[in-house]
Regions:
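Non-catalytic helical/linker scaffolds that mediate oligomerization, partner binding
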Residues: 1-295
Length: 295
């Protein structure tokens, strides 16, 4: 078993995490705010002698700026086209709102959620008419330029749906090694057709769970991905309960056991469980023991 760990850029426990026997790399979530340049943070994280995977957001829809519903506009990271009215989902699919109209990169909401919508939040619109304009964001391109200067090559790309998505990354970073994050039905279709031809796959369950629309279908989706690429990475909601309590809930244990049973041996721990030293180390220790039991 090997595990990629999401790293808070300024955590003081990264050396300890890097030395854990099952850690195979660091993931930098590029929505995290920085107090230094992109080049400087990449240089600093590289000093821990672990590969650094830079997670580019690509066509993933995210909120730009803050908005206070109801009856407000939400500015997105990309212009879109979609038939309206249409549902949009926030908070990993737990909050559904009605979009009355779309104007380029603006959603005009007809109702909630009745809270502040903050910058960086992901937005899911699950509709066959959805078209997202553009792929790489300006931040993505800035990171790729810094990686090229530093000779770094490892990239994760969100919402991959075609070979063109990977080709765009390689146009900025020709020798890049890309992990393809599969998060939509179109992405699943691409994975079934091409497997690992364009790079290893990642079952990014956070958005994938919302995008398959009917919750139970996510189980079949993660099976599809590991069948398409026996070395695929599984990510999102791995042992998240450890972020709130010292002992994981039974469902989390069963989840990891299921993933091991269907063939996953590469895991990625997400932001939630990696924010604190105790929780990330407990998650790593537990995965190590469960991995041994699965051998």
């Amino acid at each position: 078993m090997n595990v990629i760990v999401t790293v808070p850029p300024y955590a003081d426990f990264l050396a300890e995490v890097a030395s854990h026997p099952i850690v195979s790399g660091f993931r930098l979530n590029t929505v995290m705010p920085l107090r230094e340049s992109h080049r400087e943070v990449l240089q600093r994280l590289s000093k821990f002698n672990q590969p650094v995977w830079v997670d580019l957001k690509g066509r993933q829809l995210r909120v730009v700026g803050a908005a206070i519903p109801p009856y407000t506009e939400v500015k997105l990271s990309h212009p879109i086209k979609v038939e309206t009215p249409v549902d949009a989902f926030f908070s990993d699919g737990n909050e559904r709102v009605k979009v009355a109209a779309v104007d380029g990169d603006r959603l005009i909401l007809a109702d909630g959620p009745r809270r502040l919508i903050g910058p960086g939040e992901s937005v899911n619109i699950v509709h066959p008419s959805l078209k997202i304009e553009g792929t790489l964001t300006d931040t993505d391109k800035t990171y790729l330029a810094a990686m090229k200067e530093l000779g770094m090559t490892k990239v994760m790309l969100s919402y991959v749906e075609s070979a063109d998505d990977v080709d765009e990354v390689k146009s900025y970073l020709p020798n890049s090694e890309v992990i393809l994050k599969i998060e939509t039905q179109r992405g699943l279709d691409f994975a079934k057709k091409h497997g690992s031809k364009h790079g290893h796959l990642m079952a990014a369950r956070g958005d994938l769970y919302v995008e398959v629309l009917r919750p139970h279908k996510v189980a079949g989706a993660v099976k599809t991905i590991i069948k398409a690429d026996k070395d695929a990475v599984i990510a999102s909601h791995i042992l998240d309960s450890l972020a709130y309590q010292p002992v994981p809930v039974s469902a989390d244990i069963g989840d990891v056991a299921f993933l091991l049973e269907i063939g996953y041996r590469a895991f990625m721990l997400g932001d939630q469980v990696c924010l604190r030293r105790d929780t990330v180390l407990e998650a790593l220790n537990l995965l190590e023991e469960m991995g041994k039991s699965a051998e």
